[in-house]
Every structure is written in structure tokens, then in C-alpha cells.
Amino acid sequence: VCDGSYKDHFGTAGFVLQDGNNAQDRITGANVTPGHTDDMNPYRSELGGILAVVIVTEALVAFHDIQAGVIELGCDCESGITAIFEHTYDLPKQPHHDLIHEIRQRMATSTLTWTFRHVRGHQDKHTSYHLLDMWGKLNVEMDSLAKVYWNETHATVAPFYIPSTFGWSLWTTTRKLSSWD
């Protein structure tokens, strides 16, 4: 499960990899969303969280030599889930193409089968936390973690760009373009 946080042209995400309902078997982390400040928005922050889940999962797969398995990604960003899992196109003019393409390519080359689950966000505003299912609780936790990490990093982390591991990227001076027409 991952959730993004965005404010003042800066984005972060909280993420957790957990083995079913077992909260003891989990990896939790937070990341700053890559990209130029002009490209930042809530959607990109959510994509940054999805990318973090994919990268950390890839590291675990490589370290443990995992040859097959299924991972279910939970996220409250329906448009991000749609762009990654349901669209059949992958065009550079698509907003945030750099992250979407990277995520899709990494998933396509993974030894794992990736599935998704839309998790309704901010469920704790209408339902007591202890009454939420596992997915709802994890989303609330990751929302909180993303906000805490935003507060810790927004004043000190400069914009940065992830290297494109599939294909090529387009730059103008020192800025990597997230999409182009």
C-alpha cells in the first residue's frame, strides 16, 4: 500500500510491503517524489509511491532470488492505477509519462505478477480506525507517514530525477521532462 502527499510544489509518499494481515512481516518506507517542482502535484506524488513499492519489491526479489509470485498493490489513486494497469497505451504526451513508463516497464519485466486494489482514501474521517479493514488501516498509516516525511524533507531536498532504465529521456538544460508532445 502506498499513499502520496503534496503541498507547495513538493511531494512525498509513504509505502508499506506487508505479508497479508501480519503486521510483523512488513517493510515501511517513505520517499521524496522525483521531478521538477513545476511537475509536482498530488497525482505525481501517488505515482512516486507506486514507483517506490516497485523498486523496493525488485530489490527483495533480486536479493532472495524469487522466481515467481503475486503482489497486490493497494493505492487510493484510481487514475494512477488506471494509467499503470489498465491503459494499453504508453505515450510521452501522457502527463507524468516518465514515472508511468518506468513503473510499467519494471512491472512488465518482473518475475512477479502484479495486481492492484483501489483503496478508498481517508476512510478514518468517516469510520473509526479500529473498524477499518487491513487495506484501509494501511492507507491511513501511509497517508500519515507521507505527511510526516513531507514535513521532514520539504525544506532540505532539492529537485532530482530518476534515471530512465527503459529507453531514453528528454532533457532541456538541467531539467528532465516528465512528458512531451
How would you label these PLM feature ranges?
Residues 3-5, 77-78, 145:
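Anionic group-transfer/hydrolysis microenvironments
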Residues 144, 148-181:
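Charged boundary/loop elements
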Residues 1-48, 52-64, 85, 149:
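RNase H-like nuclease fold core
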Residues 34-37, 107-112, 151-157:
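Low-complexity, flexible helical/coil segments
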Residues 17, 135-141, 154-160:
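Compositionally biased, low-complexity linear motifs
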Residues 9, 48-140, 162-165:
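RNase H catalytic domain
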Residues 23-27, 97-100, 140-145:
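Glycine-rich loops and low-complexity Gly/Arg-rich segments
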